[in-house]
Amino acid sequence: VSTLLKITPMAEPYACLTWQVNNFCNFQCSYCNPGNWAGDNRNNGNLQLYIDNTMKIFNTYKQRGYKHFKIFFSGGEPTHWENFIPLVTYLKEHIPNITVAVNTNLSRPLKYWQEHYHLFDDIVASFHVEFCKKDRYIENAKFLCDKVDYLCTKMLMHDERFWEVVEFGERVRQEVPNYNLEWTPLFDEMSVNAGPWKYKDPVKQSFLENAQFESVQRIDKPYRENYAVSMAHYDTGVEPVNSNKIIAARQNFFTGWKCQVDDALFINPRGDISGASCGVGQTHGNITDTDLTFDLKPVICNKQHCHCGTDIIIPKEPVNV
């Protein structure tokens, strides 16, 4: 197994804002913490304040010389947030080079994506076997796969229905012309302090350890130059970061590493802003503050286990390098 040495920006430093817009989801998966779907923080209204403060965040990075920007929306299910489309539309109009990404369960009807696909560069389509309407997922994936720069078909590996998920992944292979297929192991409770799920069946564990990220393109799709990307430096070479690969190899342990958490601000469902989602970075107020200000600085990680894909890809390296 290759040894991870460090994670760096592909070119220049880039700023990424990950926004868990609310905690309402139309799915209530058994492996997901209720904090992700309870629905008590809908965060509707305040659109202009959200726009103003989001622009203030990115303008702060611009003033520091940053040229590359990404915003990644999650939830809950962000497509059910009433501010979602108006906010994304504004950002696309006012930050022309921004990469807009969304993590969605792809449950919206096809018409939704026909109307709004042009707003998105990256779509991470999580498959949740307990609630997903499989035919709708396939229909939407087939439509989107040649409309956006990157479509990830992300299979959440439910323990009891593991092989049903594998079977659906095979259906994606057969029916979706362009796909980026990820087999994603679960985390216990899927919360800030979550540990990796223990798959007791060694066959399942072996499947995950040997599963490869699969990228297939059979038909033409848009290509967009994107510099808001991190690179993983291994003792065997350099490649784009794949957080699943790092997790499967049990190399997502960065205690003592210098991590650029404030290049990757996180907004939780209550609106609190912090460096990354792990709880190690400092807090910077709330997205609804009328006088939002913040300072940006890295941290030396004191947490044993880095569990979130958006945190794993943040540029970081051991302090003795």
Protein language model regions, located:
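Flexible mid-to-C-terminal extensions adjoining Fe-S/redox cofactors in radical SAM and related proteins
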Residues: 1-15, 35, 39, 268-321
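N-terminal active-site segment of His-dependent metallophosphoesterases
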Residues: 33-57
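Glycine-rich phosphate-binding "P-loop"
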Residues: 40-46, 72, 76, 127
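Short pre-active-site segment immediately N-terminal to redox-active cysteine/selenocysteine motifs
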Residues: 24-28, 36
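Catalytic nucleophile-elbow at a beta strand-turn-alpha helix junction centered on a G-D-S/GDSL motif
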Residues: 23, 76-79
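Radical SAM enzyme [4Fe-4S]-AdoMet core and its adjacent flexible, acidic
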Residues: 122, 126-264, 269, 274
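Short, hydrophobic/glycine-enriched beta-strand segments
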Residues: 15-21, 72-73
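Radical SAM/AdoMet-radical enzyme domain recognition
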Residues: 51-73, 81-182
